[in-house]
Curated annotation (Swiss-Prot):
It comes from the Archaea. This is Peptidyl-tRNA hydrolase. It comes from Thermoplasma volcanium (strain ATCC 51530 / DSM 4299 / JCM 9571 / NBRC 15438 / GSS1). Belongs to the PTH2 family. It is found in: Cytoplasm. CDD domains: PTH2. The natural substrate for this enzyme may be peptidyl-tRNAs which drop off the ribosome during protein synthesis. Its main location: cytoplasm. One of its GO terms (cellular component) is cytosol.
């Protein structure tokens, strides 16, 4: 089974490309570290398969929490990222959520309906 990591980014925020890249990196690193500790077998598979990562866009913060609720109910590692507010958004603004790494079939059940960023 294919293993991947997905990051869902809010599109209602006025973030530049560099800011989005940094937020996605925060989500990916946070999820990877958590998976390395909590889901070692899946993490190792993901590493061996080339660390597939997908970034999708969601309309707003409400959608982030809908994704989180579903991921939590399925036991999928997830990390909601809140910005510190030094540059483009207010402190504490939720910018994205990372999911996985986990099996693609499970992540697609949660994020498959969203368009790629």
């Amino acid at each position: 089974m294919v293993v991947k990591l997905v990051v869902a980014v809010r599109k209602d925020l006025d973030m530049g490309k560099g800011k989005i890249a940094a937020q996605v990196a925060h989500a990916a690193v946070s999820c990877a570290i958590k998976a390395m500790k909590e889901k070692k077998k899946i993490f190792d598979e993901w590493m061996d398969e080339g660390q597939k990562k997908i970034v999708v866009k969601v309309p707003n913060v409400d959608e982030i929490y809908i994704i989180k609720k579903k991921a939590d109910s399925m036991g999928i590692i997830n990390e909601v990222i809140q910005d510190r507010g030094y540059t483009q958004v207010e402190p504490g603004t939720v910018t994205c959520i990372g999911l996985g790494p986990d099996y693609e079939v499970y992540l697609d059940d949660i994020t498959g309906k969203y368009k790629l960023l």
